[in-house]
């Protein structure tokens, strides 16, 4: 009886700690089941149980124990249990072999659908929403900001979550606070966590967002309010990984868990639904993929998506082609990043040949909410080559480039990236031509960087933001720049510029004239009208 009670307690304790799904297609559950069958076999199936010590005696001042195998045997129950363990593991191995890429290459290739387009269809980039900062920089900014708040840093630390989201069309990283240690948890868990950190990935500004209702369910809880444990109790058979921390359009905190189903056998998990947990009260709701709320950004995790995109590029012409001739075999480049397009976040990575040479064949964008994957064909330099080119432009400073982001400026593919010093802080920014990667522009701000590129190539950005201006012309001058007549004048001491082609009134402009217009980048007027 004692052994039965011991095993039941042991099963409950290990399940409470490790939380495997009660699902036969989960390797976690298979090992959990086999492990406990082995414990039961030891407790009830061996003739001598676990008492194999014959005698203990002292020799030359040392205690020695001898194993007693006399009379040891495995009874009928033990044999059944050991055979069951062997059978389960053998069946799992056989299923894995039969459903491996050797026999299922076409199925692996078709796990995801990749739509192919030309780069001319690559989304135009809103230059005010390019996430220049990388994750590590955002973490430093968030952690330092929290460190400046003495009333908070004594009780809490920033979680290492820093999920990148698109909020109101702009890229941010968000992370909840967590209890600094078990004592701080004990003192504060009743009232919960009242804030989370939000870092603007464009400007680098950080803020501590106050919550009307504090977070009660988080990854820093120790018992039943731990996020994964709470979800496992409610959904014991569902397969999910670490839920992502997200906020809705009103800034309310949630955890989003993608539910997986193996596509064949024990291989290739694919999302089938989403569970959303309200971090303030523990309420949960499961959504089908078609009904996921629009504020949710991360349904299809980056790592699984990239792995399955590689399946598509590797096995589309069969297993042996992938292993031997490697004709038309492609793979993603080493690294990825995120882009905010509209209200969604997109995974970005490059595509190169299986030989991993110094050129890309194109680029991948995946909508992380809908799972739609598009490949844009374009022969260009790899992201690593672009990084090396940018670092070479400032080699005297020993800056290291962040992983580049591909942007489309007036149908021109460009890599944009930050340049970090030894402390990991972004000091400058670089723009590298994706095709002719020796062409590099470096500046201390993104605005200056884009302005340099626009002036060098005589461009105006389609999505450039403008401001209205009305005033009186003073100190009027003109000059010819790159073949264009440009008028310079001051309004309230500030210099403005306008090209002669903007308005027919400009050749007749005089000091003292009142005008109105729209000011764009670098103080150039996009519209101009004399009143």
Per-region residue spans from a language model:
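Soluble extracytoplasmic regions of secretory-pathway and membrane proteins
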Residues: 6-531
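Positively charged n-region of N-terminal signal peptides that target proteins for export
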Residues: 1-3
């Amino acid at each position: 009886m004692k052994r039965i009670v011991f095993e039941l307690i042991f099963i409950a304790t290990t399940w409470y700690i490790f939380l495997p799904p009660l699902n036969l297609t989960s390797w976690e559950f298979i090992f959990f089941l086999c492990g406990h069958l082995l414990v039961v076999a030891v407790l009830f199936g061996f003739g001598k149980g676990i008492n194999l010590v014959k005698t203990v005696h002292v020799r030359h001042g040392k205690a020695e124990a001898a194993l007693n195998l006399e009379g040891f045997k495995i009874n009928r129950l033990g044999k059944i249990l050991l055979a069951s363990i062997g059978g389960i593991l053998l069946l799992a191995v056989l299923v894995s072999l039969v459903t491996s890429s050797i026999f299922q290459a076409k199925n692996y290739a078709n796990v995801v659908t990749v739509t192919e387009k030309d780069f001319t269809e690559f989304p135009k980039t809103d230059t005010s929403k390019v996430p220049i900062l990388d994750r590590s920089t955002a973490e430093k900014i968030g952690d330092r900001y929290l460190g400046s708040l003495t009333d908070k840093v004594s009780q809490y630390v920033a979680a290492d979550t820093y999920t990148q989201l698109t909020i109101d069309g702009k890229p941010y990283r968000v992370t909840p606070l967590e209890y600094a240690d078990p004592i701080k948890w004990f003192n504060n868990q009743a009232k919960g966590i009242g804030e989370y950190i939000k870092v603007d990935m464009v400007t680098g500004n950080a803020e501590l967002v106050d919550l009307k209702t504090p977070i009660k369910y988080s990854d820093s809880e120790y018992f039943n309010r731990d996020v994964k444990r709470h979800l496992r109790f409610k959904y014991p058979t569902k397969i999910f990984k670490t839920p992502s921390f997200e906020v809705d359009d009103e800034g309310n905190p949630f955890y989003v868990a993608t539910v997986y189903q193996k596509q064949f056998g024990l291989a290739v998990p694919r999302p089938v639904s989403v569970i959303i947990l309200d971090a303030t009260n523990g309420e949960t709701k499961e959504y089908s993929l078609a009904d996921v709320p629009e504020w949710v950004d991360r349904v299809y995790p980056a790592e699984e998506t990239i792995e399955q995109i590689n399946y598509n590029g590797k096995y589309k012409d069969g297993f042996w082609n992938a292993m031997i001739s490697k004709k038309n075999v492609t793979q993603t480049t080493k690294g990825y990043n995120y882009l905010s397009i509209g209200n969604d976040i997109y995974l970005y990575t490059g595509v190169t040949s299986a030989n991993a040479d110094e050129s890309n064949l194109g680029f991948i964008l995946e909508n992380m909410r809908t799972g739609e994957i598009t490949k844009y064909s374009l022969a260009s330099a790899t992201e690593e080559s672009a990084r090396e080119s940018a670092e070479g432009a400032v080699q005297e400073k020993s800056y290291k480039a962040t992983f580049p982001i591909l942007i489309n400026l007036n149908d021109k593919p460009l890599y944009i990236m930050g340049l970090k010093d030894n402390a990991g802080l972004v000091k400058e920014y670089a723009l590298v031509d994706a095709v002719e990667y020796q062409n590099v522009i470096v500046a201390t701000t993104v605005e200056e960087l884009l302005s340099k590129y626009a002036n060098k190539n005589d461009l105006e950005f389609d999505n450039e933001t403008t401001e209205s201006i009305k005033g009186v012309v003073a100190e009027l001058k003109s000059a010819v720049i790159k073949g264009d007549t440009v008028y310079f004048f001051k309004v309230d001491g500030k210099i403005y510029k306008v090209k002669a082609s903007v308005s027919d009134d400009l050749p007749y402009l005089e000091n003292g004239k009142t005008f109105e217009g729209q000011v764009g980048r670098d103080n150039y007027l996009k519209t101009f009208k004399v009143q």
